[in-house]
Amino acid sequence: MPFQKPDAVDQHIISILEQNGRATNREIAEAVGVSEGTVRNRIERLIRDDVLRIVGVTNPAKLGLNTAAVISISGELSRITDIAESIAVADGVVYVGYTTGNADIIVLAFFPTNDELTEFMTQTLAAIPGIVKAETNIILKPVRSLFPGTTMNVVSRQPPTLAAATPS
C-alpha cells in the first residue's frame, strides 16, 4: 500500500499519543470524534508507514544520567560515514546526525557524570580514525525536549530481555 500523508485526524491521534502513549483507542476515538476501529486502523497504518512509534520515554536525571552533552564533530570527509556509524553505537549516545556549517556531525549523549563524558571524549572518540575536532557543549538545564524516547539505550546497548521487560 502506498504511503499516505497524515491528515488532520492522524495528526490529532498523534498529538494525543504524544501526551499519553497509554491512551486507549476508545479514549482517542472519543477525543477525535471517530470510531474506535478508525483509530485502530489509523494507528496501525501510522506505525506500518514508520510515521509513529510507541515507546517509553524516560527521564535521564531519574536514571542517574546527569550530564547531557551536544558534541560537534569535524572529520576527514572521506571518513564521515564511518565516524558517524562508530559514534552511533557508543554507550550514552542517543542521537547522531550529519550537519552543515562548522561541524560535520552532531551528537547528543547522556552520561552519569562529567568524568564519564571526559572518558567518552578522551577514549571513545579519540580512538575513532578520521576525527579532526570535537567540540563539547554541556547542557546545563534543559528547557524543553522535542526528542521523546531519546534516552533509549543510554544505560546499556543491550536490548531488554522479555523477562526484564515483564513487570513482576
Model-derived segments and spans:
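A compositional/biophysical signature of low hydrophobicity enriched in polar/charged and small residues
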Residues: 1-168
